[in-house]
């Protein structure tokens, strides 16, 4: 399973004018600057990181788990990425039978396959990874990035894949992406000192550092692998860490950061297989952030305890739910239609999509 988790200041100020939020921490302009890999970042302010325990969560319950068959879709490999937008569930996965990554479009609420975009990669030995990138542009469902060559397409509202050139990004392999608007891209930038969250202007290639992630000494960007959730309404981002027992919340411009640290501050070693994994995914609607917490040394351990954690966008703990141990619930999505129903993907089942009903304390 893959964990995927991913302007000029004047443009950002215009974009963010009037947005609400949390908050925790300070606005960007009030923070000292640090530098990583020649990019300036406003450092995390004092008090932005707080220590908490899992026992601080109110305990919630799983009321029901219902499997949802998808008509016309058969997936034999669990390397799945997905994005819910408007009336569609967009699914990307590596299809061994066809030797390429495929993008499927499933209509909601009838869960019927209505389009398939393919292929990305020639196969059988060349599998071009593609990334589904959300956008708030009303004439598009999402962007689709070919990670091998940087070519960018968008998926139109009439379900066509339209080329739109190359994406502007720094040279060091960002692997989490979020379009804020037509010309603005939030992404991540690896360096030997850590990972930085940056904003890239697609018109003039201006790079602005938003947040530095470097809370373990002498650790490169790989060990800060994150999952990325967002709310366009709140203008907020949430990130959960694979190799660190912590989760963070901040504005689209990096302002008002709040990080919650549950576990140890440092890694066990600089060899990733020897480090426990914690957060495998986070996702959100406009009201809440959900994170899948599965502490283990290997993500194939089926008997590990798995929990779903729920937060509000200010980073306050809402509830923690215990999920079945023998299931492969690693990711999911939430809609604004209900605050008690979410959708989880089981990576161990062919019929992978499940509707989960929650009971908050």
Which residues does each PLM region occupy?
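C-terminal motif of bacterial Sec signal peptides marking the signal peptidase cleavage site
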Residues: 16-18
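Beta-strand-rich domains and repeat architectures in extracellular enzymes and scaffolds
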Residues: 66-101, 290-294
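Structural signature of eukaryotic scaffold interfaces centered on beta-propeller domains
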Residues: 78-85, 130-138, 175-181, 224-234, ...
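Blade-loop segments of beta-propeller domains
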Residues: 112-140, 215-219, 327-329
């Amino acid at each position: 399973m893959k964990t995927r988790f991913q302007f000029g200041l004047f443009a950002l100020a215009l974009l963010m004018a009037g947005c609400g939020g949390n908050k925790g921490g300070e606005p960007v302009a009030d923070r000292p600057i640090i530098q990583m890999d020649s990019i300036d970042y406003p450092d995390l302010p004092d008090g932005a990181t707080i220590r908490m325990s899992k026992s601080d969560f109110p305990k919630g319950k799983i009321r029901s788990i219902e499997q949802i068959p998808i008509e016309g879709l058969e997936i034999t490999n669990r390397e799945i990425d997905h994005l819910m937008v408007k009336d569609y569930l967009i699914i990307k996965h590596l299809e061994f039978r066809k030797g390429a990554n495929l993008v499927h479009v499933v209509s909601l609420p009838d869960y019927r396959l209505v389009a398939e975009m393919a292929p990305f990669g020639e196969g059988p030995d060349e599998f071009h990874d593609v990334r589904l990138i959300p956008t708030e542009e009303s004439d598009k469902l999402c962007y689709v990035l070919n990670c091998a060559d940087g070519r960018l397409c968008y998926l139109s509202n009439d379900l066509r894949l339209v080329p739109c050139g190359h994406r502007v990004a720094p040279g060091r392999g960002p692997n989490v992406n979020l379009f804020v608007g037509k010309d603005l891209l939030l992404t991540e930038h690896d360096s030997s000192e850590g990972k930085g969250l940056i904003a890239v202007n697609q018109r003039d290639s201006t790079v602005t550092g938003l947040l530095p992630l470097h809370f373990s000494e002498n650790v490169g960007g790989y060990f800060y692998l994150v999952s990325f959730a967002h709310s366009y309404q709140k203008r907020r981002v949430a990130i959960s860490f694979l190799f660190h027992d912590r989760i963070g919340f901040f504005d689209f411009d990096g302002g008002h950061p709040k990080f919650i640290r549950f576990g140890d501050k440092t890694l066990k070693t600089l060899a990733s297989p020897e480090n426990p994994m914690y957060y495998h995914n986070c996702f959100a609607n406009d009201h809440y952030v959900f994170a899948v917490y599965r502490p283990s040394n290997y993500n194939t351990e089926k008997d590990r305890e798995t929990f779903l954690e729920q937060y509000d966008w200010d980073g306050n703990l809402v509830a923690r739910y215990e999920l079945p141990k023998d299931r492969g619930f690693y990711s999911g999505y939430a809609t604004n239609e209900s605050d008690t129903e979410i959708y989880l993907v089981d990576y161990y089942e062919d019929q992978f999509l499940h509707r989960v009903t929650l009971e908050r304390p």
